[in-house]
Amino acid sequence: MRARAWWSGQLVADSTAAVRVDLTNEAPVLHFPSADVRFDLLPADGLVRRADGFVAFDHDRVRVEVFDGGDVKRFPTWGDISDLVDLLDVRPDGTARYVSTCRSDWRRPVVEGSQMLGQAIVAASRHASGRRVVSAHMVFPRAADARRPLQFDLDEVSAGRTFTTVGARVRQAGRCCATGTLLLDVTAPDVIRHAVDPPDVPGPDVCDPVDMAVTGRDIRVADGAYTGDPDAPVGPPVLDAWVRFRDLPADPCLHAGLLAQFTGHLSIAAALRPHAGIGQDAAHRTLSTAINAISLSLHAEVRADRWMLYHHQSTYAGDGMTHAECRVHDEAGALLASFTVEAMVRPFPQGAATDGRTSL
């Protein structure tokens, strides 16, 4: 891994042989070979830990960066694209049950609702082999703990010549965390066809890169619309983002699952954009935010390893809730998917911001 470290404005380490070490319930650590560290530029007051020819920096005091394709991302990161694929790649555990692996963010070990939606799409696609998920709706009544695996129980409501309907219930330690319905289709030749045009936004090469702590996932946001700064200029409740997942296996249901996995990331940011004095960084600090439900229609086969344009428009915010109507286009402009997101944006009850329990 190519990485570098900065302290007091000076480059103190630059290496192509840095090694990541994941720790349980703690931030991962990046170890630099000692030969790649400029010890003469560092104070002797505990900025580093040495072990077996390697050096680890205190990430709170030293800025550590990793190179990810053409982007530079701040370390520690959540993981890379292979970790995300492993989460989506649910395993069969009986006739109509699938289970996931787990991977936690040490800062807030809560499973994203859109991750569970993506996993349910993968599970249903494998259950009804040869049919493609065309519609999926899921609600998230209870937060799931990212430190524990998830269980997906499927109920085949009907299976005809063309369509299969599957109910999905996501459980953890016997408690229901999400429930939904998925429709799968063998698909058919066109009788009619039309689709809405994509928004007029710059291409991914000229949009601003955004670091969301996953290497191998490229994100570009148009018009500087994603910011944690509460003093940033206000804008319309619209957010356009190009997304690409690199180095994926060929499995089509994983590509569809990854498209779904990102549907919960930016709709709340779009809702906050018109409101002065409220930045995205307030989420989970002074604002209680969460995705409550997602409805997704998949209009075509998905190639998540190519650029996809996610267009988010928040059409309503009030009574502690937001509603967003969104579309996904490929780089050529074809409509891949449409989705809506229901989310909450509320002040934290007294003391709740410091409550480490995973509850909505």
Region locations from a protein language model:
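Terminal targeting signals and extreme-terminal segments of soluble enzymes
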Residues: 73-360
